[in-house]
Amino acid sequence: MTRGRSVESVHAARGVVCRAGGAEESCVGDPVMLTFWRSAMKPFQALPLIEDGVIDEFGFGENEIALACASHGATDEHLVVVEGMLRKLDIEADALHCGAHPPFDKDAAFSLRCSGSEPGRIHNNCSGKHAGMLALARHHGWNPDGYWKLDHPVQQRIRAALR
């Protein structure tokens, strides 16, 4: 990126544009480079929440959808949303299959540490995504046990949304 005649920053990018059938249309960089989706996958993992009517059934609004689609810093604002999702599902935070770690937000981490409390699963930056997956299981009447495993109906439904 330039500002006037000065180079302000340089960004490396790789990308592939494919047709619906999978044929490569255009490419920048190595199209077969192995990469990991990580959090970039979250919006796609949340598609069934919208397509299947999960958000309507449980009254999820923009904040719940946003946390199902993104990582969060475990600020008080974020925790209220995730706790609300779990309350609407009548599910406890220990049902989330994401490990506990300190909040990514430095002020939230400091406050938690000063309170003498330990981080819980709800503080995990992925807890909104996991709450969304539990909502998908609840909506369809699927047993939530193992919802993170590839052979579980939740993961199979997410895979189907990607096709």
Where are these regions (language model features)?
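Generic structural signal for well-ordered secondary structure
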Residues: 8, 38-43, 60, 75-79
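Active-site SXXK
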Residues: 38-54
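Active-site-adjacent helix/loop patches that line small-molecule binding or acyl-intermediate pockets
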Residues: 61-163
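Proline/glycine-anchored alpha-helix kink/cap motifs
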Residues: 16, 48-49, 136
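Hydrophobic alpha-helical segments, chiefly the membrane-spanning helices
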Residues: 56-58
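N-terminal, well-ordered alpha-helical segments
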Residues: 13, 43-48, 80-84
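Short, contiguous acidic and Ser/Thr-rich linear segments
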Residues: 31, 35-39
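Beta-lactamase-like hydrolase cores
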Residues: 1-32
